[in-house]
Amino acid sequence: MFDDVIAEKLKELGITSNEFSELVIRMLDYGVINREESQIETRLYDRYLQVTDLVEDYLSVLKVKIQHDKKFCFIRIYPPGAVVPGLPDDEHNAFNSGFRAKPSQQEVAVILTLRVEYEKSLREGQVDDKGCVLLPVEGLAIAMKNLLKRSLPEVLGERKSIFKRLRQLRLIQFNSELEFESADSWISIQPSITSFVGDEVLSQLYPDETTKGLIEDVL
């Protein structure tokens, strides 16, 4: 019955069931769609705008939360029970694991540092028209050392793995040919990081540098 209702509404919108399935599967598989990421995600994001209500109804059955940033054109989904800034909490659901593996401690440290650096650039007006912030890898390493007393991995393969993971989460972007050992290497921090690391965590990190308690709780 539910499928019949969806099929009927899709027909009215001129969207095929395969196109709808492609969109939903991509959202569940990747957890995020960023219109600026690629031609594929541009197409899927635009399709989402056509079927927003249907996708929300469909995923609400699974108690999946959808966060849609219309300004920077990205969608991120969260599992049932996840605490999401700006979205109501589900107090009656104990499930709180992600669709994919949670970030490692090292990844969390990099993410927190990126969030602080993004906030600094935002306050200084050093954000481009797409809401992105350019940061040299060397600058990230220094900031991470100063803020959290941690270092980026010395092994290049481990360092690349972290950055690829963060790109998968649509938190950063970089040239595929980038070698992360060069002082001239740059990454682009994406605006979606503001929803990934909420204001409560940020307030403990910036401008107050007393982060020992936060590190013990998060890392």
Predicted regions and their residues:
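Short amphipathic alpha-helical interaction segments
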Residues: L49-V55, R150-Q168
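Accessory beta->alpha helical hairpin/"wing" motif in late/C-terminal subdomains of nucleic-acid enzymes
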Residues: C73-P79, Q173-V201
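Short acidic, hydrophobic short linear motifs in intrinsically disordered regions
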Residues: V32-R43, G125-N146
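Short, amphipathic alpha-helical interaction segments positioned at domain boundaries
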Residues: V84-G98, I189-L219
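A short, conserved structural fragment
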Residues: V61-H68, F163, R167-F180
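Eukaryotic partner-binding/assembly regions in large regulatory complexes
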Residues: M1-N96
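Leucine-rich, amphipathic alpha-helical/linker segments
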Residues: F2, K9, L13, S17-L23, ...
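Short alpha-helical segments that sit at the start of domains
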Residues: I6-I15, H92-V133
